[in-house]
Amino acid sequence: MKFVKQISLLALGLCMALSLHAQPKREFRGSWLTTVWAIDWPNPHSQADAAGQLKQQQYMLSLIKLHEKANLNAIFFQVRGFADAMYKSKYEPWSQYLTGTRGGEPTYDPLQLVIDSAHARGIEVHVW
């Protein structure tokens, strides 16, 4: 009986040790930043001039800070909405939501802004 008890305790201890080892090292907490129809960003009513684009950048920074405050560690940033791009592409034109004109080049690179700002806060960026 004593031997069975010892084996049972050993098996229980081994199971506990293995389950602790199997736990993920961190949680994956993220949210989507949707650009199609300017649902989350950029503001479709912002002006297309340099001042309007500066407001777009400031608003994106506020969204990233909001992610940081909510203790999220990942952002899924939509970079393709309507066969256009939120980054410099040799295949697709710039999104009309950035400048008001499809293919109009903005004064900044939105994808690079998101990557730099999020990484500075320890937030991963995944594009879709």
Regions found by a protein language model. Name each.
Residues A50-Q58, E105-D109:
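Soluble non-cytosolic domains of exported or imported proteins
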Residues Q23-A48:
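Boundary/entry segment of secreted carbohydrate-active catalytic domains
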Residues S8-S19:
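Bacterial N-terminal signal peptides
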Residues F77-W128:
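Aromatic-lined substrate-binding rim segments of carbohydrate-active enzymes
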Residues A22-Q23, H67:
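Structural motif
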Residues K25-R29, N71-N73, H119-V125:
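Short, well-ordered coil/turn segments that N-cap beta-strands
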Residues Q58-D84:
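Catalytic domains of carbohydrate-active enzymes, especially glycoside hydrolases
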Residues M1-S8:
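Bacterial N-terminal signal peptides that target proteins for export
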